[in-house]
Curated annotation (Swiss-Prot):
This is Orotidine 5'-phosphate decarboxylase. GO terms for cellular component: cytosol. Signal peptide: none annotated. One of its GO terms (biological process) is 'de novo' UMP biosynthetic process. It comes from Legionella pneumophila (strain Lens). Keywords: Decarboxylase, Lyase, Pyrimidine biosynthesis. Belongs to the OMP decarboxylase family. Type 1 subfamily. Homodimer. GO terms for molecular function: orotidine-5'-phosphate decarboxylase activity. Substrate binds at residues 10, 32, 59-68, 119, 180, 189, 209-210. PROSITE patterns: OMPDECASE.
């Protein structure tokens, strides 16, 4: 069974990242590698996590012309990762190209999910980039586009999970960042929820980074989260 908890490796060096990884169990959590760590350490670091039998979510949010995104997704799959993502705003053709690029992997292909609206966005910011929809409307619209393209699910704030499930089906995966513990500040995330709230909303996977990586004892935080989930 795939764990619901995805620990975001929000570190700027390999030593600190691996110190945390060594305390984690691949049966209890997956790991997320984002742009900072991937740019710093590259594919070999991802392969090392896979070698340690962790499910790896490669969070690089590909967004480019369809052919480029297709090749990037194929290259990511070559690393043996469990999940990759693209920006839904890239459009239907880009999403379809990403999906098609993974067909050769058959049942062993990674999950392909689309980013809807970043959880750092606030309501007024959509208008500043020319989008007139509300946040829930835009997230739902992009989720339905991803569903049409044949993707497995989306990255979305927990605030939009219920409506996305209603529109796209219960089996459409929702991966939820912006998860904060009750005693944590929101920092640069605007639309946040606690783990328990997000699970009640229907989130399938919870991405948790700084509440774990910046904790005085991150291992205790992980253990407490696993008990709660």
């Amino acid at each position: 069974m795939t764990p619901k908890l995805i620990v975001a490796l929000d570190f700027d060096n390999q030593d600190n990242a691996l110190q945390l990884v060594e305390k984690l169990d691949p049966n209890h959590c997956a790991l997320k590698v984002g742009s900072e760590l991937f740019t710093l350490l590259g594919p070999q670091f991802v392969k090392e996590l896979v070698r340690r039998e962790f499910k790896v979510f490669l969070d690089l949010k590909f967004h480019d012309i369809p052919n480029t995104v297709a090749k990037a997704c194929y290259s990511a799959a070559e690393l043996g990762v469990w999940m990759i993502n693209v920006h839904a705003i890239g459009g239907l053709k880009m999403l379809q190209a990403a999906r098609e690029s993974l067909k050769t992997y058959g049942k062993d292909r990674p999950l392909l999910i689309a980013v809807t609206v970043l959880t750092s966005f606030e309501e007024g910011e959509l208008a500043s980039v020319g989008i007139r929809n509300t946040l829930p409307e835009q997230a739902t619209h992009l989720a339905m586009l991803a569903r049409e393209a044949g993707l497995d699910g989306v990255v979305s704030s927990a605030h939009e999970v219920k409506i996305i499930k209603q529109k796209c089906g219960e089996n459409f995966i929702t991966v939820t960042p912006g998860i904060r513990l009750p005693n944590n500040l929101k920092d640069d995330q605007s639309r946040v929820m606690t783990p328990q709230q997000a699970i009640r909303e229907g989130s399938d996977f919870l991405v948790i980074g700084r509440p774990i990586t910046q904790a005085s004892n991150p291992y205790e935080v992980v253990s407490a989260l696993l008990r709660d989930l």
